[in-house]
């Protein structure tokens, strides 16, 4: 117990024995005292124990095959992209658990560098959804940012640090947790510079943004304004280390297929070359053959490409895939709308030709999987307006004719109960 020292009336810490003159603060309890230094030490011990408890052990980290199987439950097709992402994500979090360092067979320390991901492919093919599903499986903070809203520091628009603020907000302002999250930057093809040659004028929303993103992609200690917006000198900043943040950068890259085609086509010159028509070549096949030189020609700077070593490409969804997307995944659209109708006590049914017609419309509109919900809304909107006000409907059946000819779905009336028949006859 803390007592008055022999040399005078000085109080002492009950834990370390230091007098009140040797410490900044001495806090009194019932018969005991504790100094500020002992409090700090206790806090450090508690934080270390909590961190150890929160860390996912290596044997608990899902293996690439398990990650791919999980994605299969939610995303139809894109098998190559799933495997690429599964391996990349597994290696990324394995690296974090090793503390950025690992020892080889000779006991020497090996630095493990971060590998961010570049996703290429047409709109509506599942790029964003793949990243969202990954974050959901791993239970890590996830943030989506739009590259088109970003500008170089000092110009009207968002600073790149605002991307990090979204991640911190997704982690409920737990910075330590945010530092192992995933950031998905969409529409990155829209920040390509106008020419593959460096510009002498400022390109504040193109090359300037790429330059600004370099540091956070690679890993840096960033200062983030807690309320967003521009930085100003009287504002306190949140410090976040992006070394262990996984960046998935994506875009449709319209026009890149021509650059790849021109490069690949040069190999086929000469009398013995195989001649292919444009109809024989699927544009999405070209994304699988993308090289850094193609991305530089498109308008990405070499330093930016160098920080995105893993390339995953998604392909256009065919008719069969779109039909599967409507009904097979765990949260398929048909299942979602069926549940909505069940809440009103009505059964909803889609015929096979209705699903085929919805898929055909999505292909015709060129919207991919993203357009399926809009078509479903158009088809079901009249009955969704009418059904809640009625109690005589048992079932709604959507057929191919409903989708193609824009006619109302078939409504199956509910048979009156015995009590209702008795009341009516009375």
From Swiss-Prot:
<keyword id="KW-0862">Zinc</keyword>
<dbReference type="Pfam" id="PF10431">
    <property type="entry name" value="ClpB_D2-small"/>
</dbReference>
<dbReference type="InterPro" id="IPR046425">
    <property type="entry name" value="ClpX_bact"/>
</dbReference>
<dbReference type="InterPro" id="IPR010603">
    <property type="entry name" value="Znf_CppX_C4"/>
</dbReference>
<keyword id="KW-0547">Nucleotide-binding</keyword>
<comment type="similarity">
    <text>Belongs to the ClpX chaperone family.</text>
</comment>
<feature type="binding site">
    <location>
        <position position="16"/>
    </location>
    <ligand>
        <name>Zn(2+)</name>
    </ligand>
</feature>
<feature type="binding site">
    <location>
        <position position="38"/>
    </location>
    <ligand>
        <name>Zn(2+)</name>
    </ligand>
</feature>
<keyword id="KW-0067">ATP-binding</keyword>
<dbReference type="InterPro" id="IPR027417">
    <property type="entry name" value="P-loop_NTPase"/>
</dbReference>
<dbReference type="InterPro" id="IPR004487">
    <property type="entry name" value="Clp_protease_ATP-bd_su_ClpX"/>
</dbReference>
<dbReference type="GO" id="GO:0051603">
    <property type="term" value="P:proteolysis involved in protein catabolic process"/>
</dbReference>
<keyword id="KW-0479">Metal-binding</keyword>
<dbReference type="GO" id="GO:0051301">
    <property type="term" value="P:cell division"/>
</dbReference>
<protein>
    <recommendedName>
        <fullName>ATP-dependent Clp protease ATP-binding subunit ClpX</fullName>
    </recommendedName>
</protein>
<keyword id="KW-0143">Chaperone</keyword>
<comment type="subunit">
    <text>Component of the ClpX-ClpP complex. Forms a hexameric ring that, in the presence of ATP, binds to fourteen ClpP subunits assembled into a disk-like structure with a central cavity, resembling the structure of eukaryotic proteasomes.</text>
</comment>
<feature type="binding site">
    <location>
        <begin position="122"/>
        <end position="129"/>
    </location>
    <ligand>
        <name>ATP</name>
    </ligand>
</feature>
<dbReference type="GO" id="GO:0005524">
    <property type="term" value="F:ATP binding"/>
</dbReference>
<feature type="binding site">
    <location>
        <position position="13"/>
    </location>
    <ligand>
        <name>Zn(2+)</name>
    </ligand>
</feature>
<dbReference type="InterPro" id="IPR038366">
    <property type="entry name" value="Znf_CppX_C4_sf"/>
</dbReference>
<dbReference type="Pfam" id="PF07724">
    <property type="entry name" value="AAA_2"/>
</dbReference>
<dbReference type="GO" id="GO:0140662">
    <property type="term" value="F:ATP-dependent protein folding chaperone"/>
</dbReference>
<feature type="binding site">
    <location>
        <position position="35"/>
    </location>
    <ligand>
        <name>Zn(2+)</name>
    </ligand>
</feature>
<dbReference type="InterPro" id="IPR003593">
    <property type="entry name" value="AAA+_ATPase"/>
</dbReference>
<dbReference type="InterPro" id="IPR003959">
    <property type="entry name" value="ATPase_AAA_core"/>
</dbReference>
<dbReference type="Pfam" id="PF06689">
    <property type="entry name" value="zf-C4_ClpX"/>
</dbReference>
<dbReference type="GO" id="GO:0016887">
    <property type="term" value="F:ATP hydrolysis activity"/>
</dbReference>
<comment type="function">
    <text>ATP-dependent specificity component of the Clp protease. It directs the protease to specific substrates. Can perform chaperone functions in the absence of ClpP.</text>
</comment>
<dbReference type="InterPro" id="IPR019489">
    <property type="entry name" value="Clp_ATPase_C"/>
</dbReference>
<dbReference type="GO" id="GO:0009376">
    <property type="term" value="C:HslUV protease complex"/>
</dbReference>
<dbReference type="InterPro" id="IPR050052">
    <property type="entry name" value="ATP-dep_Clp_protease_ClpX"/>
</dbReference>
<dbReference type="GO" id="GO:0008270">
    <property type="term" value="F:zinc ion binding"/>
</dbReference>
<dbReference type="GO" id="GO:0046983">
    <property type="term" value="F:protein dimerization activity"/>
</dbReference>
<feature type="domain" description="ClpX-type ZB">
    <location>
        <begin position="1"/>
        <end position="54"/>
    </location>
</feature>
<dbReference type="GO" id="GO:0051082">
    <property type="term" value="F:unfolded protein binding"/>
</dbReference>
């Amino acid at each position: 117990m803390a007592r008055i020292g022999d040399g005078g009336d000085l109080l002492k810490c009950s834990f370390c024995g230091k007098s009140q003159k040797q410490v900044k603060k001495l806090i009194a309890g019932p018969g005991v005292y504790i100094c500020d230094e002992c409090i700090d030490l206790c806090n450090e011990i508690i934080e270390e124990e909590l961190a150890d408890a929160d860390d996912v052990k290596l044997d608990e980290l899902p293996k690439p095959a398990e990650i791919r199987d999980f994605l299969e439950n939610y995303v139809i097709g894109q098998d190559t992209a799933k495997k690429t992402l599964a391996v990349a994500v597994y290696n990324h979090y394995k690296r974090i658990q090793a503390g950025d360092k690992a020892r080889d067979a000779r006991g020497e320390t090996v630095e493990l560098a971060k590998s961010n991901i570049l996703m290429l492919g047409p709109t509506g093919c599942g790029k964003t959804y793949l990243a969202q599903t990954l974050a959901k499986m791993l239970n890590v903070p996830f943030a989506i940012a739009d590259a088109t809203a970003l500008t170089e520091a000092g110009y009207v628009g968002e600073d790149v640090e605002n991307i990090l603020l979204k991640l911190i907000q997704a982690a409920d302002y737990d910075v330590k947790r945010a530092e192992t999250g995933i950031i998905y930057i969409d529409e990155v093809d829209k920040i390509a510079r106008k020419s593959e040659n460096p510009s002498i004028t400022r390109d504040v929303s193109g090359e300037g943004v790429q330059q600004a993103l370099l540091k956070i992609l690679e890993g840096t200690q960033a200062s983030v304004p807690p309320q967003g917006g521009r930085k100003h000198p009287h504002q306190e900043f949140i410090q976040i280390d992006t070394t262990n943040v996984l960046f998935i950068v994506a875009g449709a890259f319209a026009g890149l297929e021509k650059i790849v085609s021109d490069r690949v086509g040069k190999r086929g010159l000469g009398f013995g070359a195989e001649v292919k028509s444009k109809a024989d070549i699927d544009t999405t096949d070209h994304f699988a053959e993308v090289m850094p030189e193609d991305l530089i020609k498109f308008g990405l700077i070499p330093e930016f490409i160098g920080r995105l070593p893993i390339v995953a490409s998604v392909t256009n969804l065919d008719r069969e895939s779109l039909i599967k997307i409507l009904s097979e995944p765990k949260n398929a659209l048909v299942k979602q709308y069926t549940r909505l109708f069940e809440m009103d006590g009505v059964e909803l049914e889609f015929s096979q030709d209705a699903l085929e017609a919805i898929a055909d419309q999505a292909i015709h509109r060129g919207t991919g999987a993203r357009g399926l919900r809009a078509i479903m809304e158009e088809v079901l909107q009249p009955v969704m307006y009418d059904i809640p006000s009625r109690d005589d409907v048992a079932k709604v059946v959507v057929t191919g004719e409903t989708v193609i000819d824009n006619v109302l779905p078939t409504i199956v009336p509910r048979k009156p109960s015995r009590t209702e028949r008795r009341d009516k006859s009375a």
